[in-house]
Amino acid sequence: MNLLRYTSKSIQKAIEHRIEHRPDRENLHWNPELVSESPAPDEKALSSSSAARSNPYVARAPTETSDASLKETMESVKGVLGRWGRRVGEAAMKAESLAGNTWQHPLRAAMGRIAQSTKVLAEGGYEKIFRQTFETVPEEQLQNSFACYLSTSAGPVMGVLYVSTAKLAYCSDTSLVVIPLHQLKSVNPSISTVNPAEKYIQVISVDDHEFWFMGFLNYEGAVTSLQDTLQAGASVCVI
């Protein structure tokens, strides 16, 4: 409990410090797609209607289940983390009000990432969630995980992109995406010519299904990881 208090205070101070002292805050612009509820561009959208149902890599996220004791423990942890998240959120929103509209979008996106990290911590970490959510084989290893957004026709959806030795897998509260490595065709970084701050990663399967991911905290690291995974999958197919 002391560790949680210490962590919350440290993160809160760090957020307030960065907001107050960031030199380029007046020139910072955030992609509206990441924080608005308007539909994403059609060419970067995963349809949520008939097209999504026909996509073999997409499924609805299952309802979470757990035994009584684990659920009780997790609910207790979530309660503590939830209160912490609200305190951080209140502090950030106050700072946002002082900083002006320019900081509105990045702050909300940052709060979204904090909420996602809080949820992951409360549920036992990325490795545990990955193995509970997706079917895995004994020798499969989780190599990387990235909090990001998946572009859909209903708007960007926040979740986690998992990179393992066998698949790419994306998990949100509403959707699951699973692409075996041997089904990967290409991984393409894409940067908006109008606003270079808008960066995407396009993933294409061998049967030409497209997925657009955005809002990475470490964009370059995500691109490198996904491209390395694509090459590894190609090597396995050749062998």
Curated annotation (Swiss-Prot):
Q: What is the lineage of its organism?
A: Eukaryota, Viridiplantae, Streptophyta, Embryophyta, Tracheophyta
| Organism per entry | Arabidopsis thaliana (Mouse-ear cress)
Q: Which family does it belong to?
A: Belongs to the GEM family.
Q: Could you identify this protein by its name?
A: Putative GEM-like protein 3
Superkingdom, according to UniProt? Eukaryota
InterPro entries (alphabetical): GEM-like (IPR037848), GRAM (IPR004182), PH-like_dom_sf (IPR011993)
Q: Region Disordered: start and end of each range? A: 29-68
Cite the GRAM domain residue spans from the record: 128-191
